[in-house]
Structure formats: structure tokens, C-alpha cells
UniProtKB/Swiss-Prot annotation:
GO terms of biological process kind: lipid A biosynthetic process
Protein name per its UniProtKB record: Acyl carrier protein
Entry-annotated residues carrying O-(pantetheine 4'-phosphoryl)serine: S37
Native species: Rhodospirillum centenum (strain ATCC 51521 / SW)
Gene3D superfamilies in the record: ACP-like
UniProt record similarity statement: Belongs to the acyl carrier protein (ACP) family.
Length: 79
């Protein structure tokens, strides 16, 4: 697993209080991990802080799974 994936997973575990085994790349923040809309906003803010990036609202709305977050962050940090 990449460094980005590990960091994203750690943030999700800390913010949502879920078991590490539940945080897979295909896991949906809302459907699988029990996040609500406020949780997803807080996750986006945590990703922005951790990776030093800005995630515009239109992009944040499309980050629905752990993999979506990893892919977006990898794209932003590679640029």
C-alpha cells in the first residue's frame, strides 16, 4: 500500500472511529463506514491539512470512497 493510502486510511480510522479492517479502498465513507455529511466535510479538511492541498467543493462531492480520496490526492500531489 502506498504512503498516501496509508495516511488516508489512518485519517479515516481516526475521524470515523472505525476498525482498520473496514477501511478498504472500495469502502464508501457513508454506506460502509457510517459517515454522515459533516463527517465527510471533516475528512476532506483533514486530507487538505495532512497533504497540504486544496480540495474544491465540486471535487469533494465526488470523493465517495477511500480509493476516490487516494486517487485525488495522488493526482494533486503529483502535479
Amino acid at each position: 500500500m502506498s504512503d498516501t493510502a496509508e495516511r488516508v486510511k489512518k485519517i479515516v480510522i481516526e475521524h470515523l472511529g472505525v476498525e482498520e479492517s473496514k477501511v478498504t479502498e472500495s469502502a464508501s465513507f457513508i454506506d460502509d463506514l457510517g459517515a454522515d455529511s459533516l463527517d465527510t466535510v471533516e475528512l476532506v479538511m483533514a486530507f487538505e491539512e495532512e497533504f497540504g492541498i486544496e480540495i474544491p467543493d465540486d471535487a469533494a462531492e465526488k470523493i465517495l470512497t477511500v480509493k476516490d480520496a487516494i486517487d485525488f490526492i495522488n493526482q494533486k500531489t503529483a502535479a
